[in-house]
Amino acid sequence: QTLELSNKLVDQGQMVNNGTIHNNNTSNNSHNKTFNLNFFLNETCKDAMNITDFVKSLQLNLQDLERVGELGYVEGISHAFVKGLNDLEVHKRPIHCSDLKREIIHIKDKDKWERDTTNQDKLKRAIKDVSNKNIMLLDDWQKKNPGYDKYNDRKNDIYLKMMVQAMGPADHIAEKRDFGKIIRRIAKNTIIEKE
């Protein structure tokens, strides 16, 4: 009986040792799958556009201007910006968000990737530039919509609402609030998938 008990203990010990070795292999394999942000930005996204080139290439149309008038500044500008980003392949985009909760944004500018400041200065500049491109469409809208300047015309109401919304926030407090909302929407659509 002692010999039989002894053999069982040896067998159980070997099973435990085999299980431990197997667990170590699994553990080691999972460590090899860590995400490297610098590699993603500098290698995978090395051909991404610069933020200024992205804004210049963004093709806004009268529908974008009208959307700002209908939905408001935040929704309209967010839609135009995100639509432009979504039209690009992920590795060609000039903006990536590495942490949605903290809104950590990385922007390619002057051919190098940089983390945007805590105030999101580069992204705010890009948002203002997109907003200005939108405002420039007001003249085209006027030409295609005669009667916009007549008080009793329905087009006048549409034009005035569109113009007010296209101009953006009226003061610094509203600007900070609206830009914060736009940045959150951009961040949600540019979050890096860490697969």
What would you call each of these model-derived segments?
Residues T20, T26-E195:
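Extended amphipathic coiled-coil helices
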Residues Q1-H22:
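Intrinsically disordered, low-complexity regulatory regions of eukaryotic transcription factors
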